[in-house]
Amino acid sequence: MELQEYELITVLGPTASGKTAFATRLANELNSEIISADSRQVYRNMTIGTGKDLDNYIIEGKFIPYHLIDICQAGEKYNVFRFQHDFHEIFTKIKKKGKLPILCGGTGLYIESVLKGYKLLDVPENLILRSNLKDKSVDELKKILKSYKNLHNQTDTDSVRKIIRAIEIETCYPTQKNNPINSYSSIKSLIIGVNIDRELRRNRISLRLKKRLEEGMIEEVKNLLETELSPDQLIYYGLEYKYITLYLIGQLSYSEMYQQLEIAIHQYAKRQMTWFRGMERRGFKIHWIDVYEMNHLNEIFNRIHF
């Protein structure tokens, strides 16, 4: 199969793997555009904590067009249903330009939903269900969620609010047949996964966390608390926003925040890899490249053997 026979190139990998830098180099080589598959980078004013690293989108002075970054206000509801719709809108526009779009990100559910063309319901909030579940622990809620068989984002269940939303979605499927449904075809995509040694990944995560704190990540969260969002809303976004918020409202010391956040990011990267390995078991062919190969595009394509 030749490269032009694909409808899409997908670049995936865990956090701190360098997948965005690789995708932008690829886009520059192919005169392409990037569609982000990151569930948090859609939000404006959440730049440092989500690792947008927009400098990556400039290669040798050339701007690489990107999409689905900074499209929502912080606090606005965004989910896989909306992502599917937004992706296909951008995907179609890029294809009409005669370009091969590149999907890049680490949110496995978002990636899988568009590649397989999952039919998804637009699920409303269930206030009664939320009230019944709000006092349960994370472990109790995870047990409830695991009792369902439908697809849900197990890489992103690190807060009570997120798990309740996942349960809300699962309970809606058998009963809300008349809700709007996204119905899209599956997409023939070349999938490239960036594989990074576990110890190197851990070192990168630790160094990156230190760098982001030095760049003003705490100030970013503080500004969001002062101007836009409540603590509960920020905690919902998890990881950096969760732990820094807990620090700012006095529930954690700086040292506790730093240690717990670092551990949580390592755990998140591990869950991402678990999701990607699950994709392989579900029939996706992922061509894994080593992080050290990323500058050698021709060698990568020759090895993949289209």
Swiss-Prot record:
<keyword id="KW-0808">Transferase</keyword>
<comment type="subunit">
    <text>Monomer.</text>
</comment>
<comment type="similarity">
    <text>Belongs to the IPP transferase family.</text>
</comment>
<dbReference type="InterPro" id="IPR039657">
    <property type="entry name" value="Dimethylallyltransferase"/>
</dbReference>
<keyword id="KW-0819">tRNA processing</keyword>
<feature type="region of interest" description="Interaction with substrate tRNA">
    <location>
        <begin position="38"/>
        <end position="41"/>
    </location>
</feature>
<feature type="site" description="Interaction with substrate tRNA">
    <location>
        <position position="107"/>
    </location>
</feature>
<feature type="binding site">
    <location>
        <begin position="13"/>
        <end position="20"/>
    </location>
    <ligand>
        <name>ATP</name>
    </ligand>
</feature>
<dbReference type="GO" id="GO:0005524">
    <property type="term" value="F:ATP binding"/>
</dbReference>
<dbReference type="GO" id="GO:0052381">
    <property type="term" value="F:tRNA dimethylallyltransferase activity"/>
</dbReference>
<comment type="function">
    <text>Catalyzes the transfer of a dimethylallyl group onto the adenine at position 37 in tRNAs that read codons beginning with uridine, leading to the formation of N6-(dimethylallyl)adenosine (i(6)A).</text>
</comment>
<dbReference type="InterPro" id="IPR018022">
    <property type="entry name" value="IPT"/>
</dbReference>
<keyword id="KW-0547">Nucleotide-binding</keyword>
<protein>
    <recommendedName>
        <fullName>tRNA dimethylallyltransferase 1</fullName>
        <ecNumber>2.5.1.75</ecNumber>
    </recommendedName>
</protein>
<dbReference type="Pfam" id="PF01715">
    <property type="entry name" value="IPPT"/>
</dbReference>
<dbReference type="GO" id="GO:0006400">
    <property type="term" value="P:tRNA modification"/>
</dbReference>
<keyword id="KW-0460">Magnesium</keyword>
<feature type="binding site">
    <location>
        <begin position="15"/>
        <end position="20"/>
    </location>
    <ligand>
        <name>substrate</name>
    </ligand>
</feature>
<keyword id="KW-0067">ATP-binding</keyword>
<dbReference type="InterPro" id="IPR027417">
    <property type="entry name" value="P-loop_NTPase"/>
</dbReference>
